[in-house]
Amino acid sequence: MTPAEEMARLGAQAKDAARAMTRATPEAKNQALLGLAQLLHQREPEILAANARDIEAARAAGQDAARLDRLTLTSAIMEEMRAACAHVANLPDPVGATESQWQRPNGLLVGKMRIPLGVIAMVYEARPNVTIDAAILCIKAGNAVILRGGSEAIHSNTALAQTLQEAMVQAGLPASAAQLVTVPGHEAVNALCKLDQYIDVIIPRGGERLVRAVTEAATMPVLKHFKGVCHAYIEPDADLERALDIVFNGKVQRPGVCNALECLLVHKDAASAFLPLVAEKLGAAGVEFRADTTALPLMNKAPQGRVVPQRAEDLGQEFHDLVLAVRVVDSMDEALDHIARYGSNHTEIICTNDYAKAMRFLREADASMVAVNASSRFNDGGQLGLGAEIGISTSKLHAYGAMGVEELTTTKFVVLGQGQVRQ
């Protein structure tokens, strides 16, 4: 069977499963999620052993530290996945809810009912936990999902998908509502992108090259989880110690993830007080600074060799590493102009104690999450109370930001009549 034929087979099965999922009760869907949590606990040794095979192969292939970090499963991450299953199971079921209702002069009762999207294809790289996060959200929302993870995580994803399908069957739901693509290579992805007769939406989550490739190839709607070029802007009135903690957390905690900080913008009136603190604390944690000409002399507290002159290509760059671009700006206007030019609509942060400035930044910074005096690392479905996320949409249709259960549904009009006909 060719890759195209295999993708068509998966697509047809998913389409049938999606119809079955529209009949699934909230109790059956929740049973699948809670059963999955139990199975993940029981199968943890086997899943971690499969992950160890992937990590060994990735190291042998010379993968960098950021990719190895995203690939790695630990007992703590397994516990997070189990907690996500339980949390999503306890969320309200959006399917079938009537959001609004009104009566027309002719007596017709009109409403909008929330329904599943249908079949969702998820194309992602490296992170095996996405296999579970994506699947549980799709199941809760009554969708079928086709999962295509990166080839570097094939053993991990296979073990997780088998566990997932077992939980589905135990709950009386079709195993084909959550299928994993095991065919390697770009030909399978390209074929998947053409199955608009089966797939209702495709979600690419990974590097810029992957997202662009899927967006250009897809014949169905795309929800893009694009790159995270996240900025923090520091106003002169900010609490600098608090701002330092926010910048440190955003850059150092997990530098390889999409909500990590990539660029620090500092108002000129705060630069001389703030940048030495940044250089000392983040420099000691191993951060390399790409500083503009104004910032360079203010960062001499960094370890030797950790501050280098900024190049044009350092702006708008997602480093996936302990690297931070630093720029001094004259005003909030200049900071917002910089964000508009170099940002990726992911996450933008301001540190200020001025309410009017904070509200202006919230209004004008164009990103899926804009925060005041809080870390960029909070742009995450779990941290925002969604339980888990299938991705962070950086496109405004049909969702913008972290996508939880409700974002994996849509609405249809429902009309209740008593024999009315149009005049």
Curated annotation (Swiss-Prot):
One of its GO terms (biological process) is L-proline biosynthetic process. GO terms for cellular component: cytoplasm. It is found in: Cytoplasm. Its EC number is 1.2.1.41. Pfam families: Aldedh. Keywords: Amino-acid biosynthesis, Cytoplasm, NADP, Oxidoreductase, Proline biosynthesis. Pathway: Amino-acid biosynthesis; L-proline biosynthesis; L-glutamate 5-semialdehyde from L-glutamate: step 2/2. Its main location: cytoplasm. It catalyses: L-glutamate 5-semialdehyde + phosphate + NADP(+) = L-glutamyl 5-phosphate + NADPH + H(+). InterPro entries: Ald_DH/histidinol_DH, Ald_DH_C, Ald_DH_N, Aldehyde_DH_dom, G-glutamylP_reductase_CS, Glu-5-SA_DH, GPR_dom. Catalyzes the NADPH-dependent reduction of L-glutamate 5-phosphate into L-glutamate 5-semialdehyde and phosphate. The product spontaneously undergoes cyclization to form 1-pyrroline-5-carboxylate. Belongs to the gamma-glutamyl phosphate reductase family. This is Gamma-glutamyl phosphate reductase. It comes from Desulfovibrio desulfuricans (strain ATCC 27774 / DSM 6949 / MB).
